[in-house]
Amino acid sequence: LLVRKDYLETLMRFKDKQLIKVVTGIRRCGKSTLFDLFINHLESNGVSKKNIIKINFESPDYFELQDWLSVYKYIKEKLSSDSMNYIFLDEIQNVPDFQKAVDGLFIMKNCDIYITGSNAYLLSGELATLLSGRYVEIKMQPLSFKEYLSAYDDKSDLPSKYRKYIQFGSFPYILQLSEEKDIRSYLEGIYNTVVLKDIVARRKIADVGMLEKVIRFMFDNIGNPTSATNIANTMTSTRQKISYHTVENYLSALLDSFIFYKAERYDVKGKQYLSTNAKYYLCDIGLRYYLLGTKPADFGHILENIVFLELLRRGNEVYVGKVDDSEIDFVAIYNGEKTYYQVAYTVIDSDNSEKTLTRELKPLKSIKDNINVIDNHNNTF
């Protein structure tokens, strides 16, 4: 098993704390494997197997657990009364009223509860109300490049590995596949499961074809300012009529399934959050390759996407910065401290001028905060 060190250490820190541990993230990003790693850790530190209860609600072994009461009774019968029980509930969100079972177990003093979900619905509505202040969310993503590299004994030829990471993506199981056709089939399976199971079925979307057209548009416009209005207008102009409200519903579903993340805009000088022209970033660049194939990519926006995901991994709130008429790619806020990032594939112009560099630095120089600028190509300036 590929050890997801940061996530594993987070679970260890919250072990035996009177909080429900909720691991969220897109399908196949490694949530179930994280549970297996943590269970191995528990057992190697003296926890008996009889004190560990794990249920994967997508396994046929547990299909008879169709409602919250049967789940509650099943687990309660297996609890050890004289010691702590570690309960792992994998993809429980499809059990109607599952929050009642979770709440019933939580009030017992000898239950340490861990749950996963592949849809933001898990923490919406009634569950969020019922468990308010009693859970911690651990937001999981596919592999960072650092985690991806950890799977290789040979750490040489980083450019080649990085190109593969960008092209085929960062889902952990990709590392087990060597043939491109197998990788594409695997990505197709993830895409279809997320779209058909987590979006179409849950949102009861009738026009799947139109949904896929919107998804294609989004995949092709990562890092561009986007709104439901401009998507609807763009598609209507090409005789694919769709309403603003339908696009809004689709975008909400894409965010809920964790296939996209949204970066709202922030006025740096006015110190206020803006509600228009947010940017959307993919959870995994490999999915773009699967859907759009060899269509030319804007590598600047792909690099932007990777930086955005890394900032999220490090616990930042991430916004797109506005400074007068200029833009800062990212305003990252961590513990109240702001850091500003400009991301460029290169700042070297073909005529050896510094126009691109000047343009990228202009909004940063207008901010009163101290700025450190790192250039990946020339180390630093």
Describe each region flagged by the PLM:
Residues 80-98:
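Conserved P-loop NTPase "ATPase switch" module shared by AAA+ and STAND
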